[in-house]
Amino acid sequence: MHMPKRHLLCLLAGAAMLAALPARAQDKFPDRPIMFVVPFPPGGPTDAMARILATELTKELGQSVVVDNRGGAGGNIGADAVARATPDGYTIMFGTSGPLAINHSLYKGMKYDPRTSFEPVMYVG
């Protein structure tokens, strides 16, 4: 049986629209404030970059993006707070390679695994 190309294209377009229906049923993201956890004290370069990006994202998303500085232990305190947070996209670590790559070699007994506790979202520089 031969199906004309026009019918095939209409069938594929209809299937694509049906596949997109579940996405429309989801809640709009974000529906509450987003928190950038900076694992360093306020005033440093990582904090400054986080605040600039938070200001722009607040304008773009129409939802607050809050910077929460949790400095100490070379970034481990803030990184641990993010690792323990609910993985729902509302708590994001705005950090450097220290808490993720270097500290794992320097500190014993870390409560998080930098290889499995985080998902990269973007690079900022």
Describe the predicted segments one by one.
Residues 5-10:
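N-terminal export leaders
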Residues 20-22:
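N-terminal signal peptide c-region/cleavage motif recognized by signal peptidases
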Residues 25-120:
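N-terminal (or domain-start) structured segment
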Residues 122-125:
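A short glycine-rich beta-alpha junction/loop motif
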